[in-house]
Amino acid sequence: MNTIFTCAGAYGVAKQTYHCAGHKAHGTINMADALRQSCNIYYIQLGQRVGSQQFHNYFDAFGFTERTGVDLPSETGLMKYYSANQLGEVQLASSAFGQAMAITPLQMCTAVAAAVNGGYLVTPHVVDKITDTNGNVVEEIGTNIRRQVISESTSDVIRQMMEYEVGNGTGGGKNAYVSGYRIGGKSGTSEQLNMHRRADGDYKKVASFAAVLPADDPEILVYVMLDDPNNARTDYSSILAAPVAGNIISEVAPYLGIATDGEDRSQTTVTVPNLISTEWSNAQVQLNIQGLKHQLQESQSSQSAA
């Protein structure tokens, strides 16, 4: 998670030039900050390092190439994506930051759940049990774990990065923040795969936001997807979809009995972790997750030793 790439605002792959939103240059950043700032160019370079085969292996493992198996009729099987041998330079670059594919909202939910629940891809169900008129349990649906996609330690880091996105106060997920709750989230703004254009000539968009609560041990997942939102100001999901997710959480969490801890994390005091003897790259990740600005200063003794 401490992999670092440089974003100059534009990045060329074959004959295609990619940009971050507003052509913004994010500079040299790690994964936590790339997630928070939705840096397309970071993830293009990460995809190039991973390679087409490994990228597709994880795409498949997270369930994007198959039905979820939900207990509802007529689940679509018409997913669109590039297979490993179809992932050329441009296809891999586009896929690496979440475009060039068509997946269902339920597929996205099961994948996000796997990312934060310890790494397990689970079959979704409409209900968890069936009772009779007297309240006696007739059938327990149970949990069907299909496979483990990532390790529990990797899942823990993802939860921390998603909480950093919402609670840091500067990330795309800040508009999903609800006082007193530990919320993790990620925004997603993408062009629709059918490439249909609006009247103004721009491509139609999908604005989405995934939120989990509590961030350290998620019990609920909220996924908001807006199909080509008609908003004159913006189509960014951080502005349009994230507040909707926050509103849903503010209503659903009390109903489900998820208590607040009374802490306002938008202005919270952060305890600096003990990073003595920690490698600089690992220390950067931990500091970034907590939203702490930092700078490396070599001591006189270390300079002499070098």
Show which residues each predicted segment covers.
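Beta-lactam-recognizing serine transpeptidase/beta-lactamase-like catalytic domain environment
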Residues: 1-226, 296
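Ligand-recognition elements built from short beta-strands and adjacent flexible loops
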Residues: 180, 194, 224-306
